[in-house]
């Protein structure tokens, strides 16, 4: 993509309403625009990141055996009355009437609807286990939306729902999602730590939040620092095998949010030199809620004994749009964003330091064509901005690699390559630049 043809409305001044780093940088880098309190338009740069995060989430859900569908944003209020949550959910739920006076709501979550879909088709234990997921926009009418996409009213979520004949099967499904989440966040360059958590309005008796450590996080957390060195399961992980050892390894070391923190146990089990008290950002949460919804909504299947019984369920959420902010909180410096390569809007930024000069134009075009032909996402700054402005833009939007092409370097047959993550630089021969970036 040529920057001269791309829509990138960069702001020179930081908007006053931006309280945290991710909100400031997303506004300044032209990733989002606020349309109402807690509601944002996703501009091209931000949308590219959002789509890459969504793709990783989808790949890992599919790998773990979940099956994608798509549920509507609007739901019937009667479904929520069946489960008993319509009145209990509170003012965060946006309630709507259509022209026929039917009561609807803009779904804040989907346990009721997925249970209704399940009970409409599944009758026997032979169809289980089953895990269905979707990626959809949701709305919760936060009393005080703040922190940009970190605590907005409209947000993109991945929700998965598992259905099993008994508790043992449901816990196996829970473990699959637990491991899938470890892999999902690691692929995005994040170390997300699973922590025992409250179940809240979802219900049930088992839940883990996946927390990314960040000073601006909304949750206080207490951890044994040994958890930071635990290995992430590789691509060879067998989701049909016994995942209990992996889950046990990650849940044995102490890690808890403030809501469930056990001070005496923490001091008893964790040596003082390994205690870490900091803050974190929740990027996902998983729940086992047993028969909470299947009993109230009559989602029954015939078991091996021929008797109808309620299924055991779980739900598994990932905040897809929230992850954009969380990654920025974890990956930035004073100049701007430092995207992990897997989610960067553009992997390589080419900076033409003397636009209009035949030698720099030709060199930039050559690198641009060769990288694009190899499927690399490239942003070529072919504008007539001064070099300093181009450097500032490149650092702000955070492409992992920058290629600086100027007349002084080309006189020696070289271009400069900068790694945004650590700031390291190297001069390479023009003919070797593409190979170096592809290495």
From Swiss-Prot:
Top EC group: ligase
Keywords: Aminoacyl-tRNA synthetase, ATP-binding, Cytoplasm, Ligase, Nucleotide-binding, Protein biosynthesis
Listed GO MF terms: ATP binding; proline-tRNA ligase activity
CDD domains from the UniProt entry: ProRS_anticodon_short, ProRS_core_prok
Catalytic activities: tRNA(Pro) + L-proline + ATP = L-prolyl-tRNA(Pro) + AMP + diphosphate
One GO CC annotation: cytosol
UniProt keyword annotation of Lipid metabolism present: no
PROSITE patterns, per database record: AA_TRNA_LIGASE_II
Main location: cytoplasm
Protein family per UniProt: Belongs to the class-II aminoacyl-tRNA synthetase family. ProS type 2 subfamily.
Database matches in HAMAP family: Pro_tRNA_synth_type2
Subunit structure: Homodimer.
Protein name: Proline--tRNA ligase
């Amino acid at each position: 993509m040529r920057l001269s043809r791309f829509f990138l409305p960069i702001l020179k001044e930081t908007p006053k309403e931006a309280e945290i780093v991710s909100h400031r940088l997303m506004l300044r880098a032209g990733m989002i625009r606020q349309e109402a309190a807690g509601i944002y338009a996703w501009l091209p740069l931000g949308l590219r990141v959002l789509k890459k995060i969504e793709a990783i989430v989808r790949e890992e859900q599919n790998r773990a055996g979940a099956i994608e569908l798509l549920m509507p944003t609007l739901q019937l209020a009667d479904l929520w009355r069946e489960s008993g949550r319509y009145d209990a959910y509170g003012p965060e739920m946006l309630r709507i009437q259509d022209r026929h006076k039917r009561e609807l709501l803009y779904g804040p979550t989907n346990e009721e609807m997925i249970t209704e879909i399940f009970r409409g088709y599944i009758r026997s234990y032979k169809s289980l286990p089953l895990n269905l997921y979707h990626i959809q926009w949701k709305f919760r009418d936060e009393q005080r939306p703040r922190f940009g996409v970190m605590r907005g009213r409209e947000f993109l979520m991945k929700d998965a729902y598992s259905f099993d004949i008994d508790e043992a099967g449901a816990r196996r499904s829970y473990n699959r999602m637990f491991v899938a989440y470890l892999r999902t966040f690691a692929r995005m360059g994040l170390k997300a730590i699973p922590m025992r958590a409250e179940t809240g309005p979802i219900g049930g008796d088992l839940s883990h939040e996946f927390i990314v450590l960040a000073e601006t996080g909304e949750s206080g957390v207490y951890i044994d620092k040994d958890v930071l060195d635990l290995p992430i399961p590789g691509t060879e992980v067998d989701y049909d095998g016994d995942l209990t050892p992996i889950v046990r390894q990650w849940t044995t070391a102490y890690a808890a949010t403030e809501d469930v923190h056990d001070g005496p146990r923490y001091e008893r089990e964790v040596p003082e030199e390994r205690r870490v008290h900091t803050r974190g950002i929740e990027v996902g949460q998983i729940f086992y809620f047993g028969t909470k919804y299947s009993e109230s909504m009559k989602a029954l299947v015939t078991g091996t004994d021929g008797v109808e019984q309620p299924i055991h369920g779980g739900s598994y959420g990932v905040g897809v749009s929230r992850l954009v902010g969380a990654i920025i909180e974890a990956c930035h410096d004073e100049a701007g964003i430092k995207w992990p390569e897997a989610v960067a809007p553009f992997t390589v930024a080419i900076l033409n330091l003397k636009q209009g000069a035949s030698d720099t134009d030709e060199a930039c075009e050559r690198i641009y064509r060769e990288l694009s032909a190899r499927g690399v996402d490239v942003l070529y700054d072919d504008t007539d901005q001064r070099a300093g402005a181009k450097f500032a833009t490149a650092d702000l939007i955070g492409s992992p690699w920058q290629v600086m092409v100027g007349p002084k370097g080309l006189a020696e047959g070289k271009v400069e390559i900068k790694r945004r993550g650590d700031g390291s630089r190297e001069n390479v021969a023009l003919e070797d630049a593409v190979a170096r970036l592809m290495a």
